[in-house]
């Protein structure tokens, strides 16, 4: 039986060969998916890929780009949004 903490779906099961040619099951946390743009779904640059506890240890400037909607919209969608807002004034 696996330990209760390993029953979560956030752990990947990896088979390893141990002493005496035994098959062992190691558990490793699965990777977090890459950040995507909220409008078009493109991958975002400058946004770290990691679990919340790992990202919490980073400084503010390492967590996301320092521009409006940084970490939520890609530069192309941001440009479109700014133009749209300027035209609606």
UniProtKB/Swiss-Prot annotation:
Cited InterPro entries: Ribosomal_eL34, Ribosomal_eL34_C_sf, Ribosomal_L34e_arc-type
GO cellular component term, pick one: ribosome
One of the GO biological process terms: translation
Entry keywords, A to Z: Ribonucleoprotein, Ribosomal protein
Keyword Ribosomal protein applies: yes
Region ranges (Disordered): 1-32
NCBIfam families associated with the record: PRK04059.1
HAMAP family the record matches: Ribosomal_eL34
Name of protein: Large ribosomal subunit protein eL34
